[in-house]
Amino acid sequence: RPYLDALDRMLELVEAVEARGIPIHHLDLGGGLGITYTDEVPPSAEALVGALLARIDARGHGHRKIMFEPGRSLVGNAGVLVSEVLYIKPGTEQHGDPAGAGKNFCIVDAAMNDLMRPAMYQAWMGIVACQLRSDTPVVFDVVGPVCESGDWLGRERSLAVREGDFIAV
């Protein structure tokens, strides 16, 4: 539904511009077709494009050239970042500690300069241990070694890892 709402606004703008004598020959509907990060079920490209084209035709704009940019839907789930666990920093439970002091940190050799989306957009990325361990999983914030408070890859992730292990993001 958000795509259709955005399309309606775009078509209103096109109509306003053309009412002033400026012809519009094509519509670029942008990109960002959804991909699955956790349990989301984005609409298929066929369903989304079908709904958009139906709305474009219904609003009398079917004669225009329509462009789409598939964005991350083409490659978003195609890559994996592998990183080594450099250090495990257990949290403390002392009264009066600053915020976050009770957290456990898994410090890895990948950083926000390797994968910017979590730091910049709070994007959720799956993180799994590459070694199978019988250890009880611990909840960690997975962070990089850059001296910057925003250098994190995942918050509150349950992992059974040790120093020297590898994770896949």
At which residue positions do the language-model features occur?
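Active-site loop/helix belt of alpha/beta enzymes
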Residues: 1-89, 153, 158-159
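Charged (often Lys/Glu-rich) extended helix/loop segments that serve as interaction or gating elements
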Residues: 51, 62-169
